[in-house]
Amino acid sequence: MILKNTVLTVALMASSTAFAQTKPVVQFLATGGTIAMKIDPIKNAPVPAISGDDLLATVPDIGKYATIEVNNLSNVPSDYMDPPRWVQLSKAAQAALDRPEVAGVIVSHGTDTLEETAFWLDLTVKSSKPIVLIGAQRNASSSDFDGPRNLLNAARIVVDPQSKDKGVMLAMNNQINSARYVTKTHTGNVETFNSGDFGFIGEVYPDRVIYANAPQRRQYIPIKTEKMPEVEIIAMYGGADGMALRSAVDRGAKGIVVQALGMGNMNVPMYEAVKYALSKNVPVVVSTRVHNGRVLPSYGFIGGGKTTSDAGAVMADDLKPAKARILLMLLLQNGIASQADLQAAFNK
């Protein structure tokens, strides 16, 4: 009887070990942001302070779902994110996802440019496995720090079989948004990210992850060069004289995104500046400052979307300026620069 109990105990231990070994592996790429900040007692303001390992230690329950590998890529505010850092992040994510044992990737990031990084990764990383970005609206010194919950939810999303082939997602406040449409809508509220007309694609509940829909518009654009072409965003507003756009072209910008009005409209000085850029073979993409809706070549007055399109500009479709800039950069570094080819890519 003693022998039987001993054998049973050993068998149970072996079974538990085997179960632990079969837990999915998730790589956690930490880049910084409010989620990695604490209050500095001298400055009396949040500053970068904690690593990915420190954040992981606040979520002991995460081990029930996955084995987490931490890769501390940086610890910077997301305001410091730029194309070189995006290239580094894409390479790290792709390397992790190419490993058969890795189920997916979590990226912690500041919320200010989180939507840009999400879209960049969605365009430049090729895998059926999920990438889930998280951030926090409260720093780690706050009593209501939202970072640990977002990290736990991200792990649950990554290991859920339903999450395959959904591209890059953003998980905060129990909601799941897709990279293409998500945007930050509030400076301080924890429910800051949403996807406008299209809504979030799923939610995280205590018992399971539920998806309501899946992203439909996705494309892959390889990174061909380490250095991205310079693309500037120029804002249209009442009384704009177009000089900022002309100056950007004269300084060597390789592409321009105009944050236009309405469906893609602008005044005559800005329209003339667009034509100036096009005369210098600098592609111009017209987006809008309006949160929802598409840009269309609809209006025929001088500076209306129809006349600007007829002059050679590209309509950004439903991409807002920051994301239109990212797509234009990647297309240009792949040698795609004609109006027809650019328009086809923006329409995908």
Task: Annotate each language-model stretch with its function.
Residues 107-129, 266-275:
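Short Gly/Thr/Asp-enriched flexible loops that form oxyanion-binding sites at enzyme active sites
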Residues 268-348:
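ATP/nucleoside-binding phosphotransfer catalytic cores, i.e., glycine-rich phosphate-binding loops
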